[in-house]
């Protein structure tokens, strides 16, 4: 969960007669990240023919008013000879109707005569024929368009593969745990007419010399997967390192609830997440991948809003409900479970919650530092990480803050000199941070100079 999936490099050699079906199978499984040739060949005659059919079928769909969306389904396959025959037949019917319509648009009008009624009758006749042809041929036309569009993509990919006269070489990355099933499926497609090898990343020269990098593939649940784009917008972690996405998903939802705790506003976010999840509103489908983001932040905000008694910024609307809940739990009926607004007797709760948020920030920052250190160790930059001034300064800052805050709260309970000790703690922490920053900078520069001399 906290690391990317282990990858393997697939090298597959197939015959020319099997390459189209192999590429179709790989596309439907969506498991292989193909490594295409840098010097791709020009478009082949097969690709040009498929592109021509796709263009003509799209024009036919547009002429007949048929929705020709190329949303591929698992049942789509490459066109057969029957599909070619049917496509030619439908295109011939559309071309004939279009030719008749063009001839009817330019009639010969005798001098002194009007042809408005005649043109109107012809137009209605052609519109009726187009509607009839679209209703009869529409489903078949859409299916043919998807099949020929699939064939065009297969041919375009095939033109970018390394090949000899009779064979094609397909190379790419796939998750290691999917390799066995994929090879078995390829063997079934080609009936054994193939040669396949699997490599570990360290066995490849272009990975060892750093000219290419292993692609990263994650296997997250639905909740964490919805945060993947948020993390990847800052950059994708390299292969083999700790994946921060689960930490981001948990901390983001938690902090959102703490900062924007409101039962009413959280309910709106939660309902929006449900709409994205069910895909009932077509206009929101482009953001459907954020369904669990809105569900999680909405739920977190609702919980925090219930604890503080906030409902659309009103602090009294939930008071009767919270009194019933607190009385049911065996306590004294209260208007707020967490009363954070300034009032008599609420200062202690406010400071306790403030300390909780500081501790939570300390934990999140410490996790970030630990993840960074682990990643640097895996990248074999451990020595550089140990003497890096920023990490030393941040580690000393957070490492000093926690024991000092614990001592502060302990002495707060036993003595009255609170303000002086608080300022002393903060001054000491910031002094240590600045001192460590300067010392670490000097140590790093000196150490690097010594290494350069050696």
Curated annotation (Swiss-Prot):
Region (Disordered): 101-121
Gene Ontology biological process: vacuolar acidification
Protein function: Produces ATP from ADP in the presence of a proton gradient across the membrane.
Name of the protein in its database record: V-type ATP synthase subunit I 2
InterPro entries linked: V-ATPase_116kDa_su
Keyword Ubl conjugation: no
GO function term, MF aspect, one: proton-transporting ATPase activity, rotational mechanism
Keyword Protein biosynthesis in record: no
Gene: atpI2
Pfam families per UniProt: V_ATPase_I (PF01496)
Compartmental location: Cell membrane
Source taxonomy: Bacteria, Pseudomonadati, Spirochaetota, Spirochaetia, Spirochaetales
Membrane topology recorded in Swiss-Prot or TrEMBL: Multi-pass membrane protein
Protein family membership: Belongs to the V-ATPase 116 kDa subunit family.
GO cellular component: plasma membrane; proton-transporting V-type ATPase, V0 domain; vacuolar proton-transporting V-type ATPase complex
Transmembrane segments: 254-274, 293-313, 351-371, 424-444
Keywords (A to Z) from UniProt: Cell membrane, Hydrogen ion transport, Ion transport, Membrane, Transmembrane, Transmembrane helix, Transport
Domain of life from the UniProt record: Bacteria
Disulfide bond residue pairs: none
